[in-house]
Amino acid sequence: AALADAAGETRRRLGKPSVVVANAGVAHGGPFATSDPAEWRRVVDVNLTGSAHTARAFLPDLLDTAGYHLQIASLASLGAAPMMSAYCASKAGVEAFAHSLRAEVAHRGVAVGIAYLNWIDTDMIRDADRHPVLRELRTHMPPPARRTFSADDVAARLVRALERRRSAVYVPGWLRLVQLGRASLPPVVARLSRRELPRLEAEDALGPTGPLGEGGRAGHAAGTRT
């Protein structure tokens, strides 16, 4: 209902939108076995179901304007990591959703793009680094994959993708190579996890993180109220 209201307000103030970006995202960390089912579901509700609701609210406008819908995905869409099961599942889901939507609306002149983003300097990522298990997740990645990018730089890249109606945009650009080799990632991640997780368990460092960042906590509070 809130998205429908936002779509209506956008039309009244600015006219029919020709570009829509589905960007809302929250994250929790920790083992799946001990995760709170409601918190796990909340991540999927915001990241995946919320993206679908965004598309549903604005799709009539995009059909009228032959517009462009950009779905924000993640490196997690290409390769899942341990301790982030809800986030990885939701980001894999938004990738599949965007591919499906693209196939449905292409003949109507609507373009659908997917943005694959790595670590961005936001409150969510800064908060994640406070938790040993998530900090280890990032620091065990190859050096180029550990780097964070400023939100302004990423936004500029996304604007260029919007202007060109890209079907895919990668930030950083080398994520294209991950796309090509994504089938090789699960065994590599599993091998690394078998080596590192026992040590983290022994250090009692595998507890749940709760919602990450101010945005995640605000989303959690909103979900609790509803």
Where are these predicted regions, by residue range?
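SDR active-site lid
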Residues: 103, 107-173
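Conserved amphipathic alpha-helix within the SDR
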Residues: 1-15
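Conserved NAD(P)H cofactor-binding loop of Rossmann-fold oxidoreductase domains
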Residues: 23-28
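Residue(s) in the substrate-gating loop at a strand-loop-helix junction
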Residues: 74
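Active-site helix of classical SDR
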Residues: 55, 90
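Active-site loop immediately N-terminal to the catalytic Tyr-X3-Lys motif
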Residues: 32-33, 81-85
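Substrate-binding pocket helix/loop in short-chain dehydrogenase/reductase
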Residues: 31-32, 36-41
